[in-house]
Amino acid sequence: MSNVNEIVAGYIAAWNEADGGRRRDIIARTWSDDGSYLDSHRDSTGHAAIDAMIAAVQERFPGYRFRLCSGIEAHHNRVRFSWSAGGTDHAPLFFGGTDFVALAADGRMQAVTGFTDAMPSVG
C-alpha cells in the first residue's frame, strides 16, 4: 500500500483545485485508471468522469474549500476519513461527510463511496 496520508491529501487537493489541468494531474496520481466515486448524488467512473464531477461540484458551490476533519483510519486496502466543505467569506455554509476508499494494488484509489451529510441549497 502506498502512503495513505498522501493519497487522502491528493484526494482533498483534487476537490480544491480549480485549474482543470492541475486537477487532472492530481486525479491521475491518486486514482486508478478505472477508479470510481459513488454517493447519493453522483456515480462517476474513470478519470474524465471524476474530473467532470468535481468541476460540477465546484461550479455549484463556488468558493468552497474541502478539508480533512478527522484522522485517517486504514487497514488492508481500505481507508476511512471525514471531511467538511465551505467556510470562506462567499461560502459560509458548511457541509461534510465520510468517505470509504478501497485502494487498488498500486496504492491509488480504486473506489470511493461517500456518505454526505445534509447539503445546503445553493441558487
Q: What spans do the regions from the language model cover?
A:
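Short beta-strand edge/turn micro-motifs at domain boundaries
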Residues: 96-123
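A short, polar/proline- and glycine-enriched secondary-structure boundary/capping micro-motif
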Residues: 48, 91-92, 120-123
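Basic/polar N-terminal segments that are highly enriched at the extreme N-terminus
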Residues: 1-6, 119-123
